[in-house]
Amino acid sequence: MRDARISPDGKEIVFCYKGDIYKVPVQGGTATQLTTQASYEANPVWSPDGKQIAFASDRNGNFDLFIMSADGGTARRLTYHSASEIPSAFTPDGKFVLFSASIQDPAQSALFPTGAMTELYKVPVTGGRTEQVLATPAEWVCFDKSGKNFLYQDRKGFEDEWRKHHTSSITRDVWLYDASTGKHTNLTNREGEDRNPVYAPDGNSVYFLSERNGGSFNVYNFTLNTPQEVKAITTFRTHPVRFLSISDKGTLCYTYDGELYTQEPNARPKKVNVDLVRDDEKEIATLRFSQGATSASVSPDGKQVAFIVRGDVFVTSTDYATTKQITNTPAKESGVSFAPDN
């Protein structure tokens, strides 16, 4: 599960699973599938009133913006450009959807003349002409309640966004943009990843994801008056926290190790147990072989044997009657061997 967003009223969460959009109550339970296309749907965002969801879909080739009822139904296409468009947020009045796309750099800006460096645009929810908001990359936009300012994460280079423990001059920072003056303020100016900012309900503090303190991505917080004074909200260690969002009442929502979590102010994280029902899951097949292995390798400790049957790699235990399929690809695997560390 990925691309999780909690609804403004804090009662539901939308997320992406296997290329479709789902919705589940914050208490957990059976998720409702909102899209059923053969295409890939992702990056859902809620309208301020919680009645609509905008998302990206590649059903026409590249990713375009679509909008639909939060209860499901027919999706309506909003953008038609050949570039891929990824939504960030609705404007607070609900009239526009902001999105990132590499459409056209203005003549006065030659800083990012490449498809990998997007610009920020908005499109009316009723459809129509798009309008450029910023000529520089601005991702994960989050407006304050007035609509005059918004937070965003920048992008300075081509580094993989999923890379962990990245430290350099091109790591992402959290910025504040004042639309009335056009001023950009860097709130987390350091050589480390800071991203995915969201306003707290009071509008005076910010939650964001960071790898500071030498660990994995976790949720942190600072006030706008003292952004240098950062407080850790979560302390996960093994895997990174991703896809941070917040409700109007301050309930945080994010993913950890592919699972959904919520967190109330001054409380511990709570896992959201989700039941997913799909009609395209493969039936479990039991395969039995007594011959036909094309190659085999014994692990350095002698406790496992890897072998290839029907073009896929399997591993079996010498101590237990357990065999596990390791690969499942259209290609034929060959030359199996164990690494020195087992």
Which residues make up each language-model segment?
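A flexible loop/linker signature enriched in serine peptidases of the S9 family
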Residues: 16-22, 36-41, 48, 54-66, ...
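Long, contiguous interaction/recruitment modules in multidomain scaffold/adaptor proteins
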Residues: 271-272
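Glycine/alanine-rich phosphate-binding loops at beta-alpha junctions
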Residues: 31
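Signature of short aromatic-glycine-proline-rich micro-motifs recurring in repeat-based ectodomains
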Residues: 1-3, 138, 288-297
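Mature N-terminal segment immediately following signal peptide/propeptide cleavage
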Residues: 1-26, 297
